[in-house]
């Protein structure tokens, strides 16, 4: 996902245009355009087939768990009160987790995955009010699993997969690896889906369509919006999965989940939609709402929340 330019793996999308190049080219004296902001509409708590939502899942790339806790991220979580909380880019070994989160009584069942080789890198977490039937880590391939990017929890009616998808990196140096990941991850998800429908959530590190970022023309060769990454996501959807937000809001522009820290991108709403809830087709009848909580602060991403009838 896009980050500050000084970072290595996570710096890529932050180096993308993100509106800054265009801004520098503007003539002196030209009035800047007023930002167009996205307002999260009222929650829909009933599915198309008339069922009431009985599952609430929140996903948030926290860009460093310890810093996010210090920025009062948990206060927002307690107000949102999801049944399941999924976090990405925790950048924190299990032994260094803040007591504020490990001791949360609201979520007695907590699961963590981190990078085996690098401290302060990658990492995902899942916090549940109800104990899953089973929990697994990774996708069964060592080259991917050592980076701590996936947790899968099995519940009676569905699998929940939270993922922090690899960034193609500065100069697209990891694009080939990302393409391999996309193939292997898709195969993993299809294998799960053959057993039980699934919800995939997390930072998938791709803006799928031009509507999913502010400046598509300036970012075609940048990580997160390359043809290869976009095609990888298209192939995932063609394998029988659905982008829940676009299912409900197909033409909604300016709805982003990430903003680089540079150039006041967030206040200008110069962003990318990189965070998703992707559903198996079997779960679509129970889809109630897919929310972008863009007023929640504490990270360069905002949280997203899914309401589902299962």
From Swiss-Prot:
Biased composition (Basic and acidic residues): 41-51
Reaction(s) this enzyme catalyzes, per UniProt: Exonucleolytic cleavage in the 3'- to 5'-direction to yield nucleoside 5'-phosphates
Keyword tags: Cytoplasm, DNA damage, DNA repair, DNA-binding, Endonuclease, Endoplasmic reticulum, Hydrolase, Magnesium, Metal-binding, Mitochondrion, Nuclease, Nucleus, RNA-binding
GO biological process per UniProt: base-excision repair; heart contraction; heart looping; negative regulation of apoptotic process; positive regulation of gene expression; positive regulation of gene expression via chromosomal CpG island demethylation
CDD domains, sorted: Ape1-like_AP-endo
Annotated site residues (Interaction with DNA substrate) in this chain: 301
Swiss-Prot/TrEMBL site (Important for catalytic activity) positions: 275
A Gene Ontology cellular-component term: nucleolus
Pfam (any one): Exo_endo_phos
Annotated phenotype, changing residue 58 to C: Confers redox activity
Annotated EC: 3.1.11.2, 3.1.21.-
Binding of Mg(2+) 1, residues: 63, 89, 300
Chain positions covered by the region annotation Disordered: 1-51
Comment on bound cofactor: Probably binds two magnesium or manganese ions per subunit.
Catalytic class of the enzyme: hydrolase
Record-annotated active site: 164, 203
Cofactor names: Mg(2+); Mn(2+)
UniProt GO molecular function: class II DNA-(apurinic or apyrimidinic site) endonuclease activity; DNA-(abasic site) binding; DNA-(apurinic or apyrimidinic site) endonuclease activity; double-stranded DNA 3'-5' DNA exonuclease activity; metal ion binding; phosphoric diester hydrolase activity; RNA binding
Record localization: Nucleus; Nucleus, Nucleolus; Nucleus speckle; Endoplasmic reticulum
NCBIfam families for the chain: exoDNase_III, xth
Protein name per UniProt: DNA repair nuclease APEX1
Organism the protein comes from: Danio rerio (Zebrafish)
């Amino acid at each position: 996902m896009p980050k500050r330019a000084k970072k290595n793996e996570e710096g890529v999308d932050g180096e993308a245009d993100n509106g800054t190049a265009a801004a520098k080219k503007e003539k002196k004296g030209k009035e800047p355009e007023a930002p167009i902001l996205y307002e999260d509409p009222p929650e829909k708590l009933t599915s198309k087939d008339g069922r009431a939502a009985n599952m609430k899942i929140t996903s948030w790339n926290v860009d460093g768990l310890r810093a996010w806790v210090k920025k009062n991220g948990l206060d927002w979580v307690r107000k949102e009160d999801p049944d399941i909380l999924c976090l990405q880019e925790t950048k924190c070994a299990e032994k260094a987790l803040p007591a504020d989160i490990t001791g949360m009584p609201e979520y007695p069942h907590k699961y963590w995955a981190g990078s085996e080789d690098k401290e302060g890198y990658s990492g995902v977490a899942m916090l549940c009010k109800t104990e899953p039937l089973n929990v697994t880590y990774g996708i069964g391939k060592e080259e991917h699993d050592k980076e701590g990017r996936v947790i899968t929890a099995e519940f009676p009616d569905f699998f929940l997969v939270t993922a922090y998808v690899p960034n193609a990196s500065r100069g697209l140096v990891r694009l080939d690896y990302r393409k391999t990941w996309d193939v292997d991850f898709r195969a993993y998800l299809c294998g799960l889906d053959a057993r039980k429908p699934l919800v995939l959530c997390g930072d998938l590190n791709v803006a799928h369509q031009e509507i999913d970022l502010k400046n598509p023309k300036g970012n075609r060769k940048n990580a997160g919006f390359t043809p290869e990454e976009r095609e990888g996501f298209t192939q995932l959807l063609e394998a029988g999965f659905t982008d829940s937000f676009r299912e409900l809001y197909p033409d909604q522009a300016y709805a982003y989940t990430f903003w680089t820290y540079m150039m006041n991108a967030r206040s200008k709403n110069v962003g990318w939609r990189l965070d998703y809830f992707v559903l198996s087709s079997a779960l679509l009848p129970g889809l109630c709402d897919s929310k972008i909580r863009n007023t929640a602060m504490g990270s360069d991403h905002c949280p997203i929340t899914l309401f589902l009838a299962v």
